[in-house]
């Protein structure tokens, strides 16, 4: 009789034990959450190392830009949640439908009212680059709803991961009320434990009955989401290259026509304070930027992207 213990199938017990860890590892790597994590790592790393993201982490963000970021987030989540509602019974998405716990549109409306007042809808619109992402979300929801998983996971899991950190950065940098006005977006009232909910959500996602080909398409879609967001940065770069020319062409009274230019901290620091014509005051440039609707929308979408990237950073 052989010294090796055999199973009823005639398979060596030691062989079974040796292959068990391999099977477990293979199963884990086939999980959609793992595929997404690994499949988007490169895009994520590129995005989180941009100067804009680093500055935001340091609290280098102005209130006007944060207001515009809230605007871009409003349009993004309005599109996403509209398509999620449309597909709440679709078998490839239904297990991930948690409107009470996750939906952000109503919270964003409160933030919009805080920043812009009751007539906020008359004051805002979506930028060109952000609109492309919104259009993609609508296309996916209406034609390939299984790919909504990529957008929902990327947004909501990131928000749960980095939301509280982002909220504190914004409140400190912008001196927003500690009671939550202006940062309702980051408050998940119906999620008691973010870490546990994320684990639950990933388990639901991994249990979806999807082919490997569909999982790969979902990973590809998540990378597209990063790509759309990076296009917003490209849009910002183009706007920056046009900034000096547009400011000179349009003109703007120094300090919006108020006060003496000699009291400007930038001007006061110049060695030759006797000539006004040669001073290029950054405050004047900043005012010009904030008065240009096209640049406002671009900056809004860019700051919105940072929120998403920072959220991924803390996942």
From Swiss-Prot:
Which positions bear S-nitrosocysteine? 264, 281
GO terms (BP aspect): heme catabolic process; heme oxidation; response to hypoxia; response to oxidative stress
> What range does the record give for the signal peptide?
none
**Tissues expressing this chain:** Widely distributed in body with a high concentration in the brain.
The answer to whether keyword Endoplasmic reticulum applies is yes
A cellular component term (GO) from this record? plasma membrane
Task: Please give the start and end residues of each transmembrane region.
Answer: 295-315
UniProt topological domain (Cytoplasmic) ranges? 2-294
Q: What class of enzyme is it?
A: oxidoreductase
* Reaction(s) this enzyme catalyzes, per UniProt: heme b + 3 reduced [NADPH--hemoprotein reductase] + 3 O2 = biliverdin IXalpha + CO + Fe(2+) + 3 oxidized [NADPH--hemoprotein reductase] + 3 H2O + H(+)
Site (Important for catalytic activity) location in chain: 159
Q: Does Secreted appear among the keywords?
A: no
**Expression induction or repression:** Heme oxygenase 2 activity is non-inducible.
List where Polar residues composition bias occurs.
Answer: 1-15
Give the protein's recorded name. Heme oxygenase 2
Q: Which species does the entry assign this protein to?
A: Rattus norvegicus
